[in-house]
């Protein structure tokens, strides 16, 4: 799976970063990275992870991933919720295999739930999406999960103690592309997971808002369509970060994820959990 793409240089607005989100809902013409690469079929391992469809002018246009953190609340990336008025509607598909759902990408199916509202961080802008890349989707109907299956938020500053190491492992989950290169695209709408490790934190172009994780054949990683999906801390249900951006159009090398352990992020998401 792959997120938005980013060039590893912190330009004035870092607009060269590629968001890993919003691949077109029609998999035949993907535009941004969206799936887990070199990953494993998830099955029912992470039932809180859902596929999100975003409509423009009433028609399905893009897709992302997200995590159910309360029965009617889905956590995702800011660029998946968009700026005010950017999307006319959102819905989720809460099944592991959306590829064979005959209702996709339209509403009304047994595994779809329509959104009543969606919000990105109040400081989010598309032009500098990576700085405040978190959003929520509010659902019209509850997702049925057991209490231990919902994604949970980290404590403030929890990730600061992490050290770049092959032993600092995350579980990335999403519905993004499995492979993309100049001659081949594999874009099955199936929930998958990978186990990337921490490459960079609190330094370089990631700043204090992102982590850089591995993305290779050994660890797997994210791609277009995985945007907004969770990067769980180890094998826990704690969502350390949401998939945000990629470094290149092939979804290879490293991937950027937006940290959730910052106070302003926790305050923003927390208001929808009260």
Residue ranges and their predicted role:
Residues 74, 80-82, 124-125, 142-145, ...:
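Solvent-exposed loop/turn segments at secondary-structure junctions
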Residues 44-51, 168, 210-211:
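Short, hydrophobic/aromatic-rich segments at coil-to-beta transitions
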Residues 51-55, 214-216:
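Short beta-strand segments that buttress and anchor functional surface loops
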Residues 1-18:
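Sec-dependent bacterial lipoprotein signal peptides
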Residues 23, 131-219, 256, 262-266:
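Chymotrypsin/trypsin-fold serine protease catalytic domain
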Residues 20-35, 48, 52, 63, ...:
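C-terminal subregion of chymotrypsin/trypsin-like serine protease catalytic domains
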Residues 33-44, 58, 88-159, 204:
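Conserved catalytic-core segment of clan PA serine endopeptidases
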Residues 40-42, 125-128, 186-187, 219-224:
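Short Gly/Pro-enriched turn/cap motifs at secondary-structure boundaries
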